[in-house]
Amino acid sequence: MAQLKRILGIDPGSRKTGFGIIESGRFHPNYVSSGVIRVEKLTGAQRLKTIFESVCQIIDQYQPHVMAIEKVFVYKNPSSAIKLGQARGVILCAAAIKEIPIMEYTPTQIKSTIVGQGHATKDQVQFMVQNLLKLTESPQEDAADALAGALCHDRYLTLGIDPEKISKGTKF
């Protein structure tokens, strides 16, 4: 039997960051854990510090082999884009410090892989994540998005597609 690989999915946010952990390597992925890092009541640097420390703690607790994180897309509001970029930066820094490889996927890649269409709704993503992982209830939105990222990475691995090429934007 193939060795189990633990995948940490991250849905970055400046106020709420979703995380989800699955194990890959069997016939289908297995759910390990998920949740949301909430920092909306904090300000500026305290938000970033809390996100960083929380991601480090999650990595220490679950020992993932890889992180699958959603790529940033262009926002109409530059301030929101900067805040999201800062949150992503501390998340990527946590993974780098813990020596966890990072794979990046666009929201469209994740939705296409999990739901079958790149413009799927949050409800559709939650529904598919719940069914694919055989969960008794639907995960929170941000946690579902993070689990979807982990499932996307798992699917690419299962299909034998080199995740490095995916992260570099190679078209298939």
UniProtKB/Swiss-Prot annotation:
Domain of life: Bacteria
SUPFAM superfamilies per UniProt: Ribonuclease H-like
Cellular location(s): Cytoplasm
EC number of this enzyme: 3.1.21.10
One GO cellular component term: Holliday junction resolvase complex
Gene3D superfamilies found in the cross-reference section: Ribonuclease H-like superfamily/Ribonuclease H
Signal peptide range in chain numbering: none
Binding site for Mg(2+) 1: 11, 142
Cofactor binding comment, as recorded: Binds 2 Mg(2+) ion per subunit.
Record's catalysed reaction(s): Endonucleolytic cleavage at a junction such as a reciprocal single-stranded crossover between two homologous DNA duplexes (Holliday junction)
Chain residues that bind Mg(2+) 2: 70
Active-site residue list: 11, 70, 142
InterPro entries in the cross-refs: RNaseH-like_sf, RNaseH_sf, X-over_junc_endoDNase_RuvC
GO molecular function, one term: crossover junction DNA endonuclease activity
Keywords for the protein's UniProt record, in alphabetical order: Cytoplasm, DNA damage, DNA recombination, DNA repair, DNA-binding, Endonuclease, Hydrolase, Magnesium, Metal-binding, Nuclease
Principal subcellular localisation of the protein: cytoplasm
Binding partners and assembly: Homodimer which binds Holliday junction (HJ) DNA. The HJ becomes 2-fold symmetrical on binding to RuvC with unstacked arms; it has a different conformation from HJ DNA in complex with RuvA. In the full resolvosome a probable DNA-RuvA(4)-RuvB(12)-RuvC(2) complex forms which resolves the HJ.
The protein's name: Crossover junction endodeoxyribonuclease RuvC
Gene from which the chain derives: ruvC
